[in-house]
């Protein structure tokens, strides 16, 4: 190589450094290691095209579907337990599956009609759970027992949130009441209005259309928790939502609206807490461990509805978009509605979709067919055309380090991928594969177009399975 000696030395040294990083032998100093993981969130993330085609479109209520299928697992934790049988008549808001365990959530009928079947359905994690199918009578009659709950103290408030069936509506699906039921000292409420994924506008539309409900839920929670700080974090590309949230902040001097850069994944819970209140949530910890409760803006709006009326979570505002959709809209759809019915309400398809997703293009889950139902945590359904799903050929890793540089947690996705392929569980542990939030930044920036995010999912599952095996062996 005909290069000056200093240049040659530099390249040799750099190649050795990259080799070490790739093999994760200096992970104590780069990214995740024994000392924790890189928390420089404000410097991490990626710029994505916004594609907020439905921004400014108020949500439109679709007609009652002919049939709904309500899964008993639309949340993190144990599936709910069916309490109805085939042939039962139900109304909107009738309890059809009760909470079963601490981390669980009840399920309510989203239409009035007759229970047609209770059968196992396979959910996204591959497990089979009971699904309750209800034939709608088209009347959408509310259950006569629906009434606003009596709330006199913190315990009553937590019980109301539990009975509402509300889970994290930003996509995570964690039962919301569990966040409020913590025994940790809580001093800060963070409202997540970041909505950082492309296309999705359901949260921002909710902040505009239901600002008063969000304020009501905030003030109700504050009455029993007496927060020192209440922060609403919104990306700067949502001007109408920012204006509305600032209007409610004027009515309560505890509320502060923090306008955040439009950087993905700004809405990640740990990222949001750091960028709004400056607190670091360590590996394996939750917001409550740093004195915070984090709730999505749509979650708060639905808490308000339940407290005011007693109507549990039976419908969802979802963004319907993508290049294959004829008339993109924000739609109010009964939970359990087949996604095909929702697309039909939006005029159907203008071309055959290449891919249909629950959620956004970064963290969304591919839908196998159009009969699958809208879930509690569904914030969007996208039908993408060929141009939007154009993929390049995967090539070998060039060890550029872009995946680590963009990871919000400073992880080493290339190293995790290598460890997974080698079935090196010890290295997966050291690399902190379980910490990955599955945001997809690594796959997005990878010049070799390697499926790093997909491998991270498999690596997390492998590591968790090994931990469970060890725990079982020690029991």
Question: Where in the sequence are the language-model features?
Answer:
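Short, well-structured beta-strand-loop connectors
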Residues: 85-98, 117
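Hydrophobic alpha-helical positions that pack around
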Residues: 6, 227-339, 345-350
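Conserved hydrophobic positions within beta-strands
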Residues: 113-115
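Gly-rich Lys/Arg/Thr-decorated short loops/hinges at beta-loop-alpha junctions or inter-strand turns
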Residues: 168, 189-203, 324
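N-terminal, Lys/Arg-enriched amphipathic/low-complexity engagement segments
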Residues: 31-83, 133
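Ferredoxin-type iron-sulfur electron-transfer modules in oxidoreductases and energy-metabolism complexes
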Residues: 378-394, 404, 408-475
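Short hydrophobic targeting helices and cationic amphipathic motifs
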Residues: 3-6, 11
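Acidic low-complexity segments
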Residues: 117, 122-179, 183-184, 239
